[in-house]
From Swiss-Prot:
Zn(2+) 2 binds at C1141, C1144, C1171, C1174. Phosphorylated by CDK1 during mitosis. It comes from Homo sapiens. The modification Phosphothreonine is found at T731. A zinc finger (FYVE-type) spans 1119-1179. This is Phosphatidylinositol-3,5-bisphosphate 3-phosphatase MTMR3. It is a peripheral membrane protein. Residues 1029-1062 form a coiled coil. The active site is at C413. GO terms for biological process: cellular response to glucose starvation; macroautophagy; midbody abscission; phosphatidylinositol 5-phosphate metabolic process; phosphatidylinositol biosynthetic process; phosphatidylinositol dephosphorylation; protein dephosphorylation; regulation of autophagosome assembly. It is found in: Cytoplasm, Cytosol; Membrane.
């Protein structure tokens, strides 16, 4: 049997072991209200009194009208019935959930179901992490490398012991050695297989010591201070008992730790420098009574002083009374008389039973009324913050001894797996900046908590038959709370943010990953959890921007000294007092900041609120909360507004000094790299905006200012002032778009064209019960300088009304008058055009075109004029009056428009032709995409199509050849046909999303499925940090500025190359036929511009713009030329393979080139390996964190 066949059989067997269960619906109309993970199967779906409740083999999901609860089953500690009809769920992370039912029988039925679901597993394979991994294996059967990247931790975790020994600089020649006495866990089942001990301690002595220490947990070194050589060691309590036993080998080992530390300090100190002073010695602080003159400054004197070991600090986490009481159970503490040169300190930390009671009191307090009058006193009575204070003080004592006193420290409690890892892990975090990075923190957790046997299965309650409640205690959660306190005090010292810690708390209990299963490494090895489950570090990886602290500075304090008083500590509200997740993103429809997803390197993760027309608003409001940003897209809402839709809506012009990141809402203009402004209505669907603007022209006024600057006056038609005010309030998104159309173009020509093109237009509209509202908003021409004036011209909508005969209504525009001293007519395009839909089922991949030839507008001197010109900032705008030809434009289609339907089959959009403004300087093109609207408001959508995102297009200018001689001239109008190629960008995004989101299979949208914007890829609720979100917006704005500068440099380079080619052509005397194209290309700054080829008005009508990169294949860098990774500069060797990026061709290591995405430019339409930089530009979606602020930032306090 070949390997492939055997692998496929293994996948089949794995899925047979974890089969999907039959779904039981209490109501046939109910659907699963969430998207299931791989291996997840929903068992029950029913209705509570005011919610929909669903239970799967992984989670409990309760969808209320205005919020939702999404909890993994293993996070629930207990379920009980209260008040007959109410279920009371207590969670292990301090949350309490209440669910009300209509009948007592229904309440009891769900009580029984939940108690069966949360019962500790009979065997470990019953935990969801095994089913999740098995089903993932089937999905990735054809992509083994990608599967490994997704489910495995990094090399820094798998090779942690060797890397840490080298990084901390242990002297393995003279002072220390690595003992393999615990190989295959034959000495101690809860210890790692490799231990660091003094070099002269033999394995036989270690065996003797193990008989004297609790659970055979002998003293082992875990950390070395890289500057002074002081170390931290850990162990279990000595088994002194009432008989006062002692062990000579144990006493020798403890003293040897101090001697080896002194020896290691001497050897490392001699390597550093020859300039020795008292502070260079490990006992420099004790030299104050020595007259340090030249006679003692020689090498022999320094060496003799360094040999003397420092006094070792034995830190016992217990109180003295508790340590003495443990002698009755065979334990005890070190006797100072038996351990010379040692100091014993008792910290008085509470045991797990006291911590559990304190946590239960805290949980009870957090479930009370939101604002109890005695909150602070009640919080103090729980003693939770007091326990955190004692823990921080204990760790700080270790830090002070190692860093300042340069003394070695030995830490233990009773057994050495609860309070001991808390102290040593916290001390290492304070001492070493490496552990404050994401990778270092992962290594810290793996070594101090997992390798040294913290009993996660017993403490978290997900072990096999772990019914003993006395063994449960949130020890690891308490430690994470201390880390959170450090984050608050040192916001710039941690690479990871609070969301990282919140995720770690959730997955400590969720059992989605196998990292925290079992009680020790021996059990995990026997159960093969590493091979059969995914690692939590694959989610909390260093490359995930959602968990990076943007305030982090690697140059921050090397050693942290926090304030440990209770008054300086704060309750961790994100974990203990979380806000309920909104049901849908429409709850937070007012975003106070512009969308940060404007940079390709910063993919968006949230959704914009949607705007729709409803047949029955009452029904719509029953399903979700009302939209705050809803506009009058339904005729039944505002008849007065419908009667005056012809009025021109103008948005306020942004001042030249406006902060690009200070827009108060998405409806306000947002600066983009080219200087253009984009104001996006909060309710426009993503696919609609994308198709509207994807082929939009790269517009800029190409007219240099004449000696006397001309102004543009804009005036709305005669209209009721109250109505005008109302229309401005209801549609503040009205935008500026420069359009050209000859007013003399007859109705006959347009109607003739309409007869041919309108059936195609109407055929693209599918019949739906709810209407669409498509809004093109606020695309303003980027100004050349301060003196430019942006002229808002028109917005247009398409509304599909579900009443009898379907109609699409286009509002009648107001003709604009543009004057250079005298007014020139520049009529704005279409009006109201009713049409019938051809059928309910229209293929979604069809792209419809509506084209027409548009004549240019001639100015007084015979040159072509534009509606958008540069104007003096001191001039007032002139008048833009309605034209008499306005009424003749009724029932005309949008000239030069392109109709698209997205791949989701429900979006109709009207798209401006890329060259609607002829031969104006084409500067920065924009593509916006918002959330694609489907038939159902609450349908599932790809997260990659979720947030407004702008994709800059190649930069350049399109100027007429005559512009060099006549500064104020504009060039000809191109036909819409020249730019009518259909872009399928939204379809490509959807295709990429299907390939990239591997954590969940596809699901059919249903009326009960909410939007997934508040659920992360791990099925948990998304945690949002407003401060980090704002920082990402600032970072995004900075990246945009950098990209703009890069493009300007490229533009100048192209201009220089163009001038060089032109000058060389004249110099060589080549005046062949090509000379006719020189005037058209002299001023052209874009090599790809359509107007470079001819001066004929419509000669490019049959040409299509082709990017130069589209015709070239990426040239790969040869393997033999790449010795280091192009991104991280790490050297390649046997275990670090070389990987080519299929997009840029450079060579990377596996961690820097671990993403897969289609690369259409290289004819690679299946997911192919690319580097992280190319992945960010090719893939508009990424997991996990919402880059757009959904709520205004508000200060909170506990």
């Amino acid at each position: 049997m070949d390997e492939e066949t055997r692998h496929s059989l293994e996948c089949i067997q794995a899925n047979q072991i974890f089969p999907r269960k039959q779904l039981i619906r209490e109501d046939e109309n109910l659907q699963v209200p969430f998207l299931e993970l791989h291996g997840e199967s929903t068992e029950f779906v029913g209705r509570a009194e005011d919610a929909i409740i669903a239970l799967s083999n992984y989670r409990l999901h309760i969808k209320f009208k205005e919020s939702l609860v999404n909890v993994p089953l293993q996070l629930i500690e207990s379920v009980e019935c209260r008040d007959i009809f109410q279920l009371h769920l207590t969670c292990k992370d301090c949350k309490v959930i209440r669910c009300q039912f209509s009948t007592f029988e229904q309440c009891q039925e769900w009580l029984k179901r939940l108690n069966n679901a949360i019962r500790p597993p009979a065997k470990i394979e019953d935990l969801f992490s095994f089913a999740y991994h098995a089903w993932c294996m089937e999905v990735y059967a054809s992509e083994k490398e990608q599967h490994g990247d997704l489910c495995r931790p990094g090399e820094h975790v798998t090779s942690r012991f060797k890397n840490e020994v080298e990084r901390m600089g242990f002297d393995m020649n003279n002072a220390w050695r690595i003992s393999n006495i615990n190989e295959k866990y034959k000495l101690c089942g809860s210890y790692p297989q490799e231990l660091i001990v003094p070099a002269w301690i033999t394995d036989k002595e270690l065996e003797s010591v193990s008989s004297f220490r609790s659970w055979k947990r002998i003293p082992a070194v875990i950390y070395r201070h890289q500057s002074n050589g002081a170390v931290i060691a850990r162990c279990g309590q000595p088994e002194v008992s009432w008989w006062g036993w002692r062990n000579a080998d144990d006493e020798h080992l403890v003293q040897s730790v101090a001697k080896a530390c002194a020896s290691d300090s001497r050897s490392s100190g001699s390597k550093l420098s020859t300039r020795n002073t008292s502070r260079d010695f490990p006992n420099g602080g004790d030299l104050s009574d020595v007259e340090f003159d030249s006679s003692l400054s020689n090498a022999s004197g320094a060496e003799s002083l360094a040999i003397q070991p420092q006094k070792l600090l034995i830190l016992d986490a217990r109180s003295y009374a508790a340590a003495v009481a443990n002698r009755a159970k065979g334990g005890g503490c070190e006797c100072p008389e038996y351990y010379p040169n040692c100091e014993v300190v008792f910290m008085g930390m509470a045991n797990i039973h006291s911590i559990r009671r304190s946590f239960q009191s805290l949980r009870l307090l957090c479930t009370q009324m939101p604002d109890p009058g005695n909150w602070l006193s009640a919080l103090e009575s729980t003693k939770w913050l007091h326990h955190l204070s004692v823990l921080l003080k204990s760790a700080l004592l270790v830090v002070h001894a190692v860093d300042q006193d340069q003394r070695p420290v030995l830490v233990h409690c009773s057994d050495g797996w609860d309070r001991t890892p808390q102290i040593v892990a916290l001390a290492k975090l304070l001492l070493d900046p490496y552990y404050r990075t994401i990778e270092g923190f992962q290594v810290l957790v793996e070594m101090e908590w997992l390798d040294f046997g913290h009993k996660f299965a017993d403490r978290c309650g997900h072990g096999e038959n772990s019914d003993d409640l006395n063994e449960r205690c949130p020890v690891f959660l308490q430690w994470l709370d201390c880390v959170h306190q450090l984050q608050r005090q040192f916001p710039c010292s941690f690479e990871f943010n609070e969301a990282f810690l919140v995720k770690l708390v959730q997955h400590t209990y969720s059992c989605l990953f196998g990292t925290f299963l079992c009680n020790n490494a021996k059990e995990r090895g026997e159960k093969h959890t590493q091979e059969r489950t995914c690692s939590v570090w694959s989610l909390l990886r260093a490359g995930n921007k959602a968990f990076k602290n943007l305030l982090y500075s690697s140059q921050s304090e090397a050693v942290l000294y926090p304030v440990c008083h209770v008054r300086n500590l704060m309750l961790w509200s994100a974990v203990y007092l979380p806000c309920p997740s909104p049901t849908t993103p429409v709850d937070d429809s007012c975003a106070p900041y512009p969308a940060p997803g404007t940079s390709p390197d910063d993919p968006p993760l949230s959704r914009l609120p949607k705007t729709r027309s409803y047949d029955n608003l009452t029904t719509a409001c029953d399903n979700t909360v009302p939209l705050a940003s809803r506009r009058c897209s339904d005729p039944s809402l505002n008849e007065k507004w419908q009667e005056h839709r012809r009025s021109l809506e103008l948005s306020s012009l942004a001042g030249p000094g406006e902060d690009p990141l200070s827009a108060d809402s998405l409806g306000k203009p947002t600066r983009v790299p080219g200087g253009a402004e984009l104001s996006v209505a909060a309710g426009v669907a993503e696919g609609q905006m994308e198709n509207i603007l994807q082929e939009a022209t790269k517009e800029e006024s190409g007219v240099e200012e004449p000696a006397h600057r001309a102004g543009i006056e804009i005036q709305e038609g005669k209209e009721d002032p109250l109505l005008e005010k109302e229309s401005r309030r209801k549609t503040p998104e009205a935008s500026a778009i420069g359009l050209h159309q000859d007013p003399e173009l007859g109705d006959a020509a347009l109607r003739s064209h309409l007869d041919m093109s309108w059936p195609l237009f109407s055929q693209g509209i599918s019949e739906q019960q709810s209407g669409l509202s498509v809004l093109l908003s606020s695309l303003q021409v980027p100004p050349r300088g301060e003196d430019s004036l942006e002229v808002p011209v028109e917005q247009f909508r398409i509304e599909e009304i579900a009443e009898g005969r379907e109609e699409a209504v286009l509002p009648i525009p107001v003709d604009a008058k543009v004057g250079y001293g005298t007014s020139q007519s520049c009529s704005l395009l279409p009006s109201q055009v009713p049409f019938e839909t051809r059928g309910p089922n229209v293929d979604s991949s069809t792209d419809m075109l509506v084209e027409d030839k548009v004549k240019s507008v001639s100015g007084p001197q015979g040159h072509h004029r534009s509606c958008l010109v540069n104007s003096g900032k001191d001039r007032l705008p002139q008048t833009m009056e309605p034209s008499p030809s306005e009424t003749s434009l009724v029932e005309r289609p949008q000239v030069g428009s392109v109709v698209h339907r997205t791949s989701l089959g429900s979006t109709l959009s009207l798209t401006r032709s890329p060259c609607a403004l002829p031969l104006a300087e084409c500067k920065e093109g924009l593509v916006c995409n918002g959330a694609p609207e489907t038939e159902n408001r609450a349908s599932e959508q790809p997260p990659g199509l979720s947030t407004l995102q702008m994709y800059p297009t190649p930069n350049g200018h399109c100027a007429n050849g005559e512009a060099g001689r006549s500064k104020d001239s504009l060039s000809r109008q191109l036909s819409a046909m020249s730019c009518s190629s259909a872009h399928l960008h939204s379809r490509n995004l959807h295709h990429k999303w299907l390939h990239s989101h591997s954590g969940r299979p596809s699901a059919t949208s249903s009326p009960d499925q909410p939007s997934r914007s508040h659920l992360d890829d791990d099925g948990m609720s998304v945690y949002t940090d407003t401060i980090q979100q704002r920082l990402r917006q600032i970072e995004s704005g900075h990246q945009q500025e950098v990209e703009t500068l890069k493009k300007q440099v490229q533009e100048l380079k192209s201009r220089l190359e163009s001038q060089y080619l032109t000058s060389s052509l004249h110099f060589n005397g080549d005046f062949g036929d090509e000379v006719t194209s020189i005037p058209d290309s002299e001023s052209n700054l874009d090599q790809n511009c359509l107007s470079r080829c001819s001066t004929e008005i419509f000669s490019e009508a049959s040409w299509e713009q082709v990017d130069k990169q589209d015709t070239e294949m990426t040239r790969w860098l040869p393997d033999h030329l790449a010795a280091h990774c192009y991104a991280c500069d790490s050297a390649f060797w046997l275990a670090s393979r070389k990987h080519h990026c299929r997009n840029c061709g450079n060579v990377f290591c596996s961690s820097c080139c671990n993403q897969k995405v289609p690369v259409p430019s290289q004819q690679l339409f299946e997911p192919s390996r690319v580097c992280k930089s190319c992945y960010s530009s090719l893939h508009p979606t990424s997991s996990s964190i919402d880059l757009e602020l959904d709520k205004p930032i508000a200060a909170t306090s506990n």
